[in-house]
């Protein structure tokens, strides 16, 4: 088994565990008023344990356990990205695991168990959906029926003056995976942490998309292994980035 094969198998098992809770959880509120469930905690515990067995010595930074990391290589885990969807019975939620080395995501897997899509990527090797290669859009025309993904807070804060349609799916990683497979022309993300980004980042990059800071257009070259909030980000194929940045009012 390669590291990527092992990661895919782990994320699939974690997704099945999450699915066993789906439709029967009672959420509690975190200090920031966002939801957390017994499923989030159980999935993160499972991933911490299994990653520790398969990749001994590599630290884990996760959303639900308030513990930092000390080295420059770590697994970054979001046990359920889209907890509000999960609680409400909306099937757009995912288990996300990425490996960050010296600030760069190098391996990633994202699994949507409720509809069976598993995305994976390895730096320099490509990106796949359920084992088939995927690629972001390569044309340069933004059409009326094209889709631009916005995170929940982006929708509340931004005006979009582009001919396309807007989709806010309630999970940050969807902006990355749906850009990677060519479903979205881009995705705009605000108020995210590294665990929202790491796995999706390598998938989108390997599929031909770029990740830039929305305000400046500067490439986002490194991800911090901290719990800090990240700047507003845009993920999109390079040919769409100038148009999208021009068409979005912060």
Kindly label every feature range from the protein language model.
Residues 62-64, 131, 170, 215:
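Short loop/edge segments at beta-strand edges and connector loops
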Residues 18, 40, 51, 83, ...:
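Residue-level signal for inorganic ion chemistry
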């Amino acid at each position: 088994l390669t590291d990527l094969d092992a990661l895919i198998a782990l994320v699939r098992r974690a997704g099945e565990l999450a699915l066993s809770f789906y439709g029967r959880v009672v959420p509690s509120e975190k200090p920031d008023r966002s939801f957390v469930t017994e499923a989030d905690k159980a999935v993160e515990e499972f991933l911490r344990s299994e990653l520790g067995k398969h990749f001994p010595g590599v630290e884990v930074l996760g959303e639900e356990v308030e513990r930092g990391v000390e080295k420059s290589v770590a697994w970054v885990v979001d046990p359920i990205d889209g907890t509000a969807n999960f609680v409400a019975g909306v099937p757009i939620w995912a288990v996300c695991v990425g490996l960050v080395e010296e600030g760069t995501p190098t391996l990633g897997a994202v699994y949507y168990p409720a509809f069976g899509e598993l995305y994976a990527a390895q730096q320099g090797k490509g990106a796949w959906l359920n084992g088939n290669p995927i690629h972001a859009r390569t044309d340069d025309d933004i059409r009326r029926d094209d889709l631009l993904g916005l995170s929940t807070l982006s929708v509340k804060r931004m005006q979009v003056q582009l001919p396309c349609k807007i989709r806010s799916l309630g999970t940050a990683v969807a902006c990355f995976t749906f850009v990677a497979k060519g479903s979205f022309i881009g995705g705009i993300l605000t108020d995210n942490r590294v665990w929202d980004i790491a796995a999706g980042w390598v998938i989108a990059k390997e599929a031909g998309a770029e990740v830039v800071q929305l305000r400046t257009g500067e490439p986002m070259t490194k991800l911090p292994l901290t719990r800090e909030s990240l700047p507003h980000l845009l993920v999109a194929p390079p040919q769409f980035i100038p148009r999208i940045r021009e068409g979005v009012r912060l």
